[in-house]
Design a protein with these regions (language model features):
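Catalytic cores of carbohydrate-active enzymes across secretory and cytosolic contexts
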Residues: 1-854
Length: 854
């Protein structure tokens, strides 16, 4: 018999999943790993790291993955380690003491909607500033014991991971997240099955799973459409953040707003205030309107209720940041909603148009948000002013400076962004009440009592830590991208750990002007190669995959950094994420920001640097316009010299070079006998003491309650009391005014000849009288004298508004009279403005009927 060389059948493999069995002694670790409280508490991350430092790094500093990968033998050893157990018990006791505090019942409850959340680098559901802000906000809501929940998406791929080709071309890599290895929990229904939210998309439903992220005490609920219940066209709705075409964007915004509200309803969650963090979430108010109408209210009554409890925060003045949808596309998915709300299709479209009735105008989410939210705010004082101008067309008859649009300047979550070294300094020298009283400048001023040496050495230690990281990571990415190994040695040798280190890291959009530093390469080369004043620049940031200009900027910087005169002096670090950001904002000496004013809404990366004794050097835009103090940082003038942007760029670049050469570098290198710069340390201390207390997330959260949440919750409660009596009353009053508005008649006017001829003298008081037939509205009309003039910049603005008083009433006839005068001579325009008045309105723009007459 001939023997075969081999003989085997095909194995009948069976897939098995081996889950790590955590010993009972270590169950506390599992509980803490599934609450991202650990992300801003060093004691917790230090504990996880101590279990296995090598594996902690390999696990990407993700405690869920760490516990999964620990061998059973290792787990058994840890369970018997008394030192580890004692440390675990101590951290867990702090965790439970934190978690067991009940929410503050004296503050309104809030539902917070946002497209992205930057909570930890482990959870890739963020791209940049908007998400980081939302993540910080959730954390501070937890720390401040606020009754809040977040609504967002669990992205399968999230935002892209960035790598760079050797020529500097950005490469976008989308890596799928393994949901089973994330600090999240699937939400189950009453039957113990995965909860599913069925979201109507006109002729069919999209089905979304619900996940929960425990952000300390605050829950964040995330929707996920990547499941077999959905078609291949709808599964990708939650694949990528800001990915796909406009149709997918609309699908995302329907899911976030409408799906988010349906999810809260299914979870049994009802809040006092609904906060749309950007226009992406605006459609939540469509679902809310449907719910109230279907419960028995008219559309107008429902609108009063919804508006009174809605807040819209706008984050950008840049047009690309506001979503517009063609009527055909919008109708494809939203066509069924007008009937549910008791309105026509055109009425729904008009709610998203600046010019109602203009069929050529697309539906704008930002406009819809403004029309359905009682309050609107920007994210810094200047951005609030810019937003007033940007949205002024929505409330015709009122000028930007009269707008109700407010602002809350962004802050940052101190425990997340302050390096442990600085937390140690503050903990040692600041009052024990510091963490609960972060806006108290008196506490921050205790930095002046810290020795100069301690401040300098803390900064130096963090810089050296960053330099070590750069050398390691830059070498790794250089070789990964097949760079010349011999050249990397030369480059790393040129990195000077004692040189002044300036950081520039942010989204690479053209208005952020990353190119500004490279306007004059010869002058820049002299600066970076001055042996007496060595300086290095670190760049990092991603450009949107569809932003060719932004990617071009990255490529240009990388190309310049490879030139011999800039080698090791200009460094671009790839894949800017939260982990890298924490290293940069704590490790550099100066944080530079050079946006085109006034396009930087806030720019909170500089605030993060501020918490770490890093000095800001920025354009007076966003938060820095408010934050800058002489002797506590550097600023480019807010004055715009040239309207032609390239000329302004050249001037700003020259200013940057001059400040570096004449002020910044000489100050940094003015060393005393102890080896540090007293002037530099003084600037650090001024920055921390005078600026930092005003830019914490604690202050931001408190501002939202003071300026918006409490006001809205109080008014909303008044409107819904006694079966919505007040809401019905206001809606009926508005309907009556609207029905009679065009019939209101100015019967007669009395004004002196000077006013008629337009020859008015300053300082002289003039009287005007109007008799108005209000057509039965019973003193529901107000009239005022409005004077306009041109300011120093040549822009027309309001000079004065003089209310006219009712001095006589006979039936429907109301006599209005006012005395007014001009303090200044010059050219003015005067007109009379009629408007509906009602003390129950939150502001004039709430019912924007205006008639001008002369």
């Amino acid at each position: 018999m001939k023997i075969k060389i081999s003989n085997s059948n095909v194995p009948a493999w069976k897939d098995v999943t081996v889950k790590s069995r955590i010993p009972a002694e270590l169950k506390k670790l599992e509980e803490m790993a599934r609450n991202i409280w650990w992300a801003w508490n060093n004691e917790a991350t230090d504990l996880f790291q101590s279990l296995d430092p090598v594996l902690w790094k390999e696990a990407g500093q993700n405690p869920v993955v760490l516990l999964e990968r620990l061998s059973y033998e290792k787990l058994e050893a840890l369970a018997a380690d008394k030192v580890i157990l004692a440390r675990m018990d101590e951290v867990y006791a702090n965790f439970r003491a934190y978690m067991d505090v009940k929410p503050d019942a004296n503050r309104p409850s809030v539902a917070y909607f946002c497209m992205e959340y930057g909570l930890t680098h482990v959870l890739k559901i963020y791209s940049g500033g908007l998400g980081i802000l939302a993540g910080d906000y959730m954390k501070e809501a937890s720390d401040s014991n606020v009754d809040m929940c977040g609504v967002g998406f669990l992205y399968r791929y999230g935002y892209f991971a960035q790598s760079l080709a050797m020529d500097g071309q950005q490469i976008a890599n989308y890596d799928a997240q393994n949901f089973g290895s994330l600090p999240i929990d699937r939400v189950l229904d009453e039957n113990g099955q995965p909860m599913v939210i069925d979201v109507p998309y006109l002729n069919y439903y999209v089905h979304a799973y619900v996940w929960r992220v425990n952000v300390g005490r605050v829950p964040l609920y995330l929707l996920d459409t990547d499941n077999e219940m959905n078609s291949e066209f709808d599964r990708p709705i939650t694949h990528q953040l800001y990915g796909g075409d406009w149709e997918n964007r609309l699908k995302q915004e329907i899911l976030l707003g409408i799906g988010g509200m349906l999810m809260l309803k299914k979870l049994g969650i009802k809040k006092d205030v609904y906060h749309c963090n950007e226009g992406h979430a605006a459609l939540c108010n469509v679902q809310r309107l449907c719910d109230y109408v279907e419960s028995g209210l008219t559309f107008n009554e429902a609108m009063e209720v919804v508006r009174s409890s809605s807040l819209y925060t706008v984050h950008t003045p840049v047009p690309a940041g506001h979503d517009y949808f063609d009527e055909g596309l919008f109708g494809k998915y939203m066509g069924g909603y007008p009937q549910r709300m008791g309105i026509t299709w055109n009425e729904l479209m008009d709610m998203g148009r600046i010019n109602p009735g203009d069929s050529g105008e697309r539906f704008c989410m930002s406009t819809f948000a403004c029309n359905t939210c009682q309050e609107v705010n920007g994210v810094s004082w200047l951005h609030g002013e810019v937003s007033k101008d940007m949205f002024s067309g929505i409330w015709k008859g009122y000028f930007p400076e009269e707008s109700h649009v407010g602002y809350v300047t962004n802050g940052v979550h101190f425990p997340t962004w302050a390096a442990s070294e600085w937390k140690g300094v503050y903990g040692k020298h600041f009052d024990k009440s510091f963490m609960g009283d972060q806006s108290n400048q008196k506490i921050w001023e205790e930095i002046y009592n810290v020795s100069d040496e301690e401040v300098w050495n803390t900064r130096l230690a963090l810089k050296h830590k960053l330099i070590d990281y750069i050398r390691k990571e830059f070498s790794k990415t250089w070789l990964k991208n097949q760079g010349d190994p011999s050249r990397i040695v030369s480059l790393l040798d040129k990195i000077n750990p004692n040189a002044l280190l300036i950081g520039f890291a942010r989204r690479f959009a053209t208005y952020k002007r990353a190119h500004l530093l490279f306007t004059d390469l010869d002058r820049l080369a002299k600066i970076v190669n001055n042996p007496n004043y060595p300086v290095q620049f670190l760049f990092a940031g991603k450009a949107h995959p569809h932003d060719g200009a932004g990617q071009g900027l990255i490529k240009k910087i990388v190309e310049i950094s490879r030139r011999p005169e800039f080698l090791g002096k200009i460094i671009f670090l790839e894949n800017y994420d939260m982990k890298l950001a924490r290293r940069l904002v704590s490790g550099v000496d100066i944080w530079m920001n050079t946006p085109t004013r006034p396009l930087e809404a806030s720019g909170t990366s500089g605030e993060k640097a501020l918490m770490n004794g890093v000095i800001n050097f920025s354009v007076l835009d966003g938060w820095w316009l408010e934050g800058y103090r002489p002797g506590a940082g550097w600023a480019l003038t807010e004055k715009r010299t040239y309207q032609y942007q390239p000329h302004q760029d050249q001037l700003d670049a020259a200013t940057i070079y001059g400040l570096l050469e004449n002020e910044i570098l000489p100050l940094y290198y003015a060393r005393n006998v102890k080896g540090y710069s007293e002037g530099w340390v003084k600037t650090i201390k001024n920055s921390i003491a005078q600026i930092a207390p005003h830019y914490t997330m604690k202050r931001q959260l408190d501002d939202y309650f003071t300026k918006f949440y409490c006001k809205e919750a109080k008014r909303h409660a008044e409107l819904v009391a006694n079966d919505y009596a007040k809401a019905k009353e206001i809606a009926a009053w508005k309907e009556e005014v609207a029905s009679k508005w065009d019939a209101i008649e100015v019967v007669s006017t009395e004004k002196c000849e000077n006013i008629v001829n337009g020859n008015i003298e300053s300082g002289v008081e003039y009287t005007i009288t109007h008799v108005v037939d209000e057509k039965g509205l019973n003193d529901a009309i107000g009239i005022e004298v409005v004077a306009m003039h041109k300011n120093a910049e040549g822009k027309e603005c309001v000079y004065s508004v003089t209310p006219m008083e009712v001095v006589k009433n006979e039936g429907n006839l109301y006599t209005f009279s006012a005395k007014f005068s001009f303090d200044n001579a010059g050219d003015f325009k005067v007109a009379y403005r009629m408007y509906p008045k009602n003390e129950a309105l939150p502001h004039r723009q709430d019912f924007c009927y205006v008639r001008w007459f002369n």
